[in-house]
Amino acid sequence: MKKDSRMIQKYTTHFSLIILLATTASAMDNFHFYRPPFWGISFGEPRLIEPHLTSLDLAFGGGSTKKAYGGCCHSTTSLLSLYGPYNMHLVGSNVPGKDPRSQEDIALVELARTAGRDCFWGYIEYCGKFKLFETQILFTQNLRHGLFMQIGLPIRHMSLTKVCLKDLTPEACPCPGVESHTWQTFLALYDQILKHYDLRAGTFNKTNIGDLSLIVGWGCNYQDMRVLDYVDLDFKIGMLFPTGKKQNVNEVFDIPTGYDGHLGVGVSSDIAIGVYNWLTFGGYGGAILFADKTRMIRMKTDMRQNGYIKLAKGCANVDPGVIWYAGGFGKLDHIAAGFSLLGGYTYCAQQRTRLSPENTHLFNPTATNCDATLGGWDMHTIHLLADYDCAREGHHFSPRIGFFANLTVGGEHIYKMQVTGGNFGFDIAYEF
């Protein structure tokens, strides 16, 4: 009986890692510049060996931040200036459709004509506070011969508050200085200028679903080896459907709740190695490729413009950069009854997005693609998790609960966000 109990624990442990890794990497709407990847939905009750096992997992967590990692040596900056200060001196340069009778356009033309100096004249900075609360839902169904399928959907509540503008022009700047009539006229008309171009640089508060993931995977395991307890491998491919709310191009700081309307295909592979009946090491990696799409977006009209504020908009083909990720973990499995501890690391990044404007007479492709906001991002994350599973031998229903922390520790062009929360899930084993 004691030997059988050890065998059951061994089986449940290595099957938990198959699904653990599958749910971690295959919840494809999980890699964004504004928060670390969730790593709490999958670590819980060990996976049982029955081929028709059904699982439902929920993870919920949140955090807030006023800081971001900019583009130099993991340095921190204010949240909304992660691409550097905004060059408002040339914000109206080459913008099509200006009205020579409009006071807003006159202010833009006069500002661009003024010869600035290399002392941040005409530059501003934006600050704000970003809050996120997210729920991840994942349904997993085991089939036969190691095959399984998954359906994942996130629900996100995001808000941006305390948005403020700071003039970076130093008082000691030589002519033209902070008191320049042209600059002060621009600042006085700034809100009207944004409104004139259908823009709003303010707060937002929204709740919506993210992008739906449908995944098919295959797992295999090797056990009863001389040195190792087991080795688990799995391979997955899935589709990412654009069910999330798209970015509002008329809101300067708006963030889409998914991948902004782009269809995606994800592939990944994982490995887990168990030793000593209580220690597990593993690694994983994958990539998400997106289909291009033609839509209305904001674009730069001068290579010297910088930041989120772009007055001109037009149709362009948007080709998002590939997202790829890799990581590893170590797990102390069932060190006290059903209690386990886990620590891990993930590196994820998105490559540069490419734009192809439809009207190349109004939008120079070189200028539109010389945009830091299209340049991609990368993120380093530390994961910590503690969980307890309530599995009992002979029971078909096995619940679990856990708590996690996902900590962003470095990167470029990302929010400096820490997400903490909890997860709950259960397995149902069927007998046929």
Model segments located where?
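Short glycine/proline- and aromatic-enriched beta-strand/turn motifs that initiate or cap beta-hairpins
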Residues: 27-131, 136-140, 246-248, 303-310
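Short loop/turn motifs that connect adjacent beta-strands in outer-membrane beta-barrel proteins
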Residues: 28-29, 43-54, 140-146, 162, ...
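Outer membrane beta-barrel transmembrane domains
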Residues: 55, 67-92, 149, 162-191, ...
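Outer-membrane beta-barrel pore domains and translocons
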Residues: 61-63, 154-158, 219, 238-242, ...
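Flexible, solvent-exposed coil segments and beta strand-coil junctions
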Residues: 110-120, 189-200, 243-263, 302-312, ...
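Residues that define the transmembrane beta-barrel architecture of outer-membrane proteins
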Residues: 129-135, 207-212, 231, 259-267, ...
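Residues on the lipid-exposed face of transmembrane beta-strands in outer-membrane beta-barrel proteins
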Residues: 135-141, 151, 214-220, 237, ...
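Long, hydrophobic, well-ordered secondary-structure blocks that form the structural core
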Residues: 150-270
